[in-house]
Curated annotation (Swiss-Prot):
Organism per entry: Cricetulus longicaudatus
Name of the protein described by the UniProt record: Protein phosphatase 1 regulatory subunit 15A
Modification sites for Phosphotyrosine: 234, 365, 462
Lineage summary: Eukaryota, Metazoa, Chordata, Craniata, Vertebrata
Superkingdom of origin: Eukaryota
InterPro entries: PPP1R15, Prot_Pase1_reg-su15A/B_C
Pfam families per UniProt: PP1c_bdg
Biased composition (Pro residues): 62-71
Length: 590
């Protein structure tokens, strides 16, 4: 491919594109100027903007074009390569000259104008024998071609970069720190992104020296984004396929450097923690301690530290140790293991403590004690602890002992079992055989006596002609409930022993005071009014009228009057006019 006649000195990205970032109007002016210069050659907007920026770089740093020693001259390159490649390589230079904006628009001074005359004349001399316009097919091929090879060290430049990070900080062999300064300046700029830096294959020679300088300086206060900006990328897929080894080597070395720095920081932070206080060591935050990948390993280390702490501490400290929160203790995955460790600690605590301490131990909440899965096992252990307390704990007050609730004492199952206590059977041995025999028939064998003793319900069958069995004894309450009842009954009997029970009756006062309640007009009074009031008035009116009618019609309804009336009706000669007309007396007007 023929080398480009463009100058090879390139500005930094922020120097070339700062005005485009600050003022979007400059891009529109550059596009308008390119249309005025070459109206018949339309180009895509990103390409024109970038080529205008490349022309600014060329104008700002005038230098004669360099011809590499390992490349043939322009004529030989055109003869050896295809004509399409030659034109595609020369296309960017033509676009740069066509789309270049005037120095007044770019804000350059008169001195810059004078300095630009030389490079422009040289560029025109190089492009004098070349065609001005390219065909659409070659233009598209030129756009797809991502780079133009030029320079003595093999520096690669992007013809049409795809993002705003198109400017690649190139360097020469004399100054080896150019790339470092460029990347630091770009990291300080607001538009910096850690994953958008571009890798240039021409800089592979200086990567080793740059990495050595970076390691020797070792800036600790550098920003986190600067460490991630060491990831390099290829300029285009073609160079990636051609030379993959330099890119991989550089990326692998940079990754190793980042890992080494992280390990050094972790060592420094771990050494800063005093090894004397092991209890506080578990609470010190170490970088990367709470990550998900290292969660299991950290929990294991925390358990080991907990075991190391448990040996030199006193029993009281061990008792408080169960209440100390350890990192990762309440996670769901380690819940079962934590519960097991808590039980072991509880067993270890039970031996050195006093009986009074054992009595209080049953009331102390242990982590994971009230979980649903371990409820049955905890309940069994609580019952055992309660039995051990009754024998080992010297209760000073019997009154307190009755009111102390032992776990599992008043459950429904235990209440049913202790309905017939052993003490009552031992105290009254004569009652137990009769009590057992009541559930059996008269001629039945006594094999089921043991079963009847433990049965919850007892049924007695009476055959005709048989003598009924004596009534069953009343069910006895457990001893603890009997004690509670006696304690509750004693205060009522000892209140006033001189006063007999018969004299205790209710006395009413002889002076009675009547208080009249005034009903105000309100919701209660309004609720009393309604249609039932009208119905009550109508009912009373109808009853009054019926009573008046019976008073008037009563003499006419007697049997004698009815017989005389029937005789008159049987004689048709009796004129109807002789009948008394008293309709007006039946229903007097009111």
């Amino acid at each position: 491919m023929a080398p480009s006649p463009r100058p090879q000195h390139i500005l930094l990205w922020r120097d070339a594109h700062s005005f485009h970032l600050l003022s979007p109007l400059m891009g529109f002016l550059s596009r308008a100027w390119s249309r005025l210069r070459v109206p018949e050659a339309p180009e895509p907007w990103p390409a024109e903007t970038v080529t205008g920026a490349d022309q600014i770089e060329a104008d700002a740093h005038p230098a004669p074009p360099l011809v590499p020693e390992n490349h043939p001259p322009q004529g030989e390159a055109e003869e050896s390569g295809t004509p399409e490649e030659g034109k595609a390589a020369q296309g960017p230079c033509l676009d740069v000259q066509a789309n270049s904006s005037p120095p007044e628009t770019l804000g350059l001074s008169d001195d810059d104008k004078q300095g630009q005359d030389g490079p422009r004349e040289q560029g025109r001399a190089h492009t004098a024998g070349l065609p001005i316009l390219l065909s659409p097919g070659l233009q598209s091929a030129d756009k797809s071609l991502g780079e133009v090879v030029a320079g003595e060290e093999g520096v690669t430049e992007l013809a049409y970069p795809t993002s705003h990070w198109e400017g690649c900080p190139s360097e020469e062999e004399e100054d080896g720190e150019t790339v470092k300064k460029a990347f630091r300046a770009s990291a300080d700029s607001p538009g910096h992104k850690s994953s958008t830096s571009v890798y240039c294959p021409g800089e592979a020679e200086h990567q080793a020296t740059e990495e050595k300088q970076t390691e020797n300086k070792a800036d600790p206060p550098s920003s986190p984004s600067g460490s991630h900006s060491r990831a390099w990328e290829y300029c285009s897929k073609q160079e990636g396929e051609a030379d993959p080894e330099p890119h991989r080597a550089g990326k692998y070395q940079l990754c190793q450097n980042a890992e080494a720095e992280e390990e050094e920081e972790a060592k420094v932070s771990s050494l800063s923690v005093s090894s004397g206080n092991a209890f506080l060591k578990a609470w010190v935050y170490r970088p990367g301690e709470d990550t998900e990948d290292d969660d299991d390993s950290d929990w294991g280390s925390a358990e080991e530290e907990g075991k190391a702490l448990s040996s030199p501490t006193s029993p009281e400290h061990d008792f408080l140790k169960a209440w100390v929160y350890r990192p990762g203790e309440d996670t769901e995955d380690d819940d079962d293991s934590d519960w097991g460790s808590a039980e072991e600690e509880g067993k270890a605590l039970s031996s050195p403590t006093s009986p009074e301490h054992d009595f209080l131990k049953a009331w102390v909440y242990r982590p994971g004690e009230d979980t649903e899965d371990d409820q049955d096992s905890d309940w069994g252990s609580a019952e055992k602890d309660g039995l051990a307390q009754t024998f080992a704990t010297p209760h000073t007050s019997a009154f307190l002992k009755t009111w102390v609730c032992c776990p599992g004492e008043d459950t429904e199952d235990d209440d049913c079992e202790v309905v017939v206590p052993e003490d009552s059977e031992a105290a009254d041995p004569d009652k137990s055989p009769s009590h057992e025999a009541q559930g059996c028939l008269p001629g039945e064998q006594t094999e089921g006596l043991v079963e009847a003793e433990h049965s919850l319900f007892q049924v007695a069958f009476y055959l005709p002609g048989e003598k009924p069995a004596p009534p069953w004894t009343a069910p006895k309450l457990p001893l603890r409930l009997q004690r509670r009842l006696t304690l509750l009954r004693t205060p009522t009997q000892d209140q006033d022993p001189e006063t007999p029970l018969r004299a205790r009756k209710v006395h009413f006062s002889e002076n009675v005071t009547v208080h009249f309640l005034a009903v105000w007009a309100g919701p209660a009074q309004a609720a009393r009014r309604g249609p039932w009031e009208q119905l009550a008035r109508d009912r009373s009116r109808f009853a009054r009228r019926i009573a008046q009618a019976e008073e008037k019609l009563g003499p006419y309804l007697t049997p004698a009057f009815r017989a005389r009336a029937w005789a008159r009706l049987g004689n048709p000669s009796l004129p109807l006019a002789l009948e008394p007309i008293c309709d007006h007396t039946f229903f007097p007007s009111q």
